[in-house]
Amino acid sequence: VQSVGEIESLIQHFPSVNFVETHLVGDVFGRPKSVRLRSLLDLITDGPSMIINSDIEITTSTEVFTGYWGDLQHNSIKMGVRWDCSRRFNVPPALLKYGIDVFLLSPETARMLPDLGMTIGCPAWDYWIPWHLNRLSVTIHTSKRIEFMHEVHEVNWSKNEYDIGIRIMQDNYPNLTSPMLGSFIQELTGRTALKLRKIPV
């Protein structure tokens, strides 16, 4: 899924990819070329589908991957936490302390998520999905298996975008605080006591 005008420049580099054009962009964050999460959720109509960040490498075999991700129970979602590595600095994989990069959703759970302006690649979208669905009693499963690898790089979003994401959450969920949200995600993903080594970028 790409914003209007982006597909023409991308298709020559990725001729086998089936691009879908959308007008739903990250205008709330001032990102007219980034797509809103809603544009992806609207495509989940025929069965469970995976939303995954574009810079994630899946390292497991097809058989192993589908063994876990190929099944989704009613009224539930599956989430995947990435592992960061740095081949450039020869740093081994380390489980990401914050953030979630992979979501397996059914058409039913996708419809439960309203369009609040959340945008792929901008802060809070990955925290918002489980926060909202948890309030609707959706069962959430988290995988921390070493299968989603990510080469570390500089952060692509700003402090202002972070503040916008948190403000969207607080405007829609009264009394929610940033520490409360962070604690919820840490407990949900079982990373409350995780200590990560510093990875150079």
Question: Model-predicted segments: where are they?
Answer:
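A structural signal for short, well-ordered beta-strand segments and their strand-loop junctions
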Residues: 1-2, 49-51, 77-80, 139-145
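Short, solvent-exposed loop/turn segments at secondary-structure junctions
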Residues: 4-7, 25-26, 54-57, 83-86, ...
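Short amphipathic alpha-helical segments and helix-helix/interface helices
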Residues: 8-11, 41, 62-70, 129-130, ...
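Conserved catalytic core of nucleotide-sugar-dependent glycosyltransferases
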Residues: 56-134, 192, 196
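Domain-length accessory/inserted modules outside core catalytic folds
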Residues: 32, 46, 61, 87-90, ...
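Active-site-proximal specificity loops/subdomain of glycosyltransferases
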Residues: 2-52
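C-terminal catalytic/acceptor-binding lobe
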Residues: 119-201
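Preference for well-ordered, secondary-structure-rich cores of eukaryotic proteins
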Residues: 1-6, 47-49, 56, 69, ...
